Regions:
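A short, charged helix-loop
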Residues: 79-102, 106-148
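Glycine-rich nucleotide/cofactor/substrate-binding loop typically near the N-terminus or early
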Residues: 16-87
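Short coil/turn connectors at secondary-structure junctions
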Residues: 6-9, 24-27, 49-53, 74-82, ...
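Active-site loops and adjacent core secondary-structure elements that bind or stabilize anionic groups
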Residues: 129, 133-189
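Generic structural signal for well-ordered, non-membrane alpha-helical segments
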Residues: 10, 14, 49, 62, ...
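Short acidic, glycine/serine/threonine-rich loops at helix termini
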Residues: 22-26, 33, 40-43, 68, ...
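N-terminal phosphate-binding or glycine-rich loops at protein starts, especially the Walker A/P-loop
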Residues: 1-30, 113-114, 120
Length: 189
């Protein structure tokens, strides 16, 4: 974070992460200040907003996109860093199903997919394992990236997304799949 701040990167975040960033003495804009919409449904909806996703998905080289983000006052978002809710750790902890379900990240996974889709213009860092490569890149080039670097981060992001969704599938398959298969087998006999 300090490296990003030193490079002149303006940070935008939600809730607890924003508080953490500010506790380090680094300024951070609240997502709610950009969207002019509060976090709702007990925090289930924070970043799912056109002013966030428009800023990520905007194609910088397409005049029509640039005109629309100007018209709707959407800030360009060039770097997305996501730390997904710990779904697998919550399952492994033996938590009950309501707690497990709350750890299915919707906004985070959507941010990852949007940023990875627009890797031509956006860097996506989808896991803590990618923090050091990002820091190394920033130290070497400043706050600029190559298409090859952005594409690598996008590939890694889709790997994180795929793994996360597979873990959720495996949870539901293990919990309900076995009961469904047993029911189907009972109907065959």
């Amino acid at each position: 974070l300090r490296t990003l701040h030193a490079q002149g990167v303006e940070l935008l975040s939600t809730g607890g992460t924003q508080t953490f960033i500010e506790s380090l003495g680094i300024p951070c804009v609240k997502v709610e200040d950009v969207t002019t919409y509060p976090s709702i449904l007990g925090g289930r909806v924070k970043t799912l907003h056109p002013k966030v996703f428009g800023g990520i998905l905007c194609r910088r080289g397409l005049e029509q996109d640039m005109q629309q983000i100007e018209k709707y006052e959407i800030p360009e978002i060039d770097l997305v860093i996501v730390d997904l809710y710990p779904f697998e750790a919550t399952v492994a902890s033996g938590a009950d199903e309501p707690a497990i379900i709350e750890k299915i990240d919707i906004g985070g996974i959507s941010l990852i997919r949007a940023a990875a889709k627009n890797y031509n213009d956006v860097v996506i860092v989808a896991s803590q394992a990618q923090y050091q490569p990002l820091r190394d890149m920033l130290m070497e080039h400043g706050a600029t990236t190559s298409l090859e670097e952005r594409r690598w981060f996008a590939k890694e992001a889709f790997a994180v997304s795929s793994h996360y969704d597979s873990a959720i599938f495996n949870y539901f398959d293990g919990e309900e799949g076995s009961a469904f298969r047993q029911s189907a087998n009972d109907q065959k006999t």
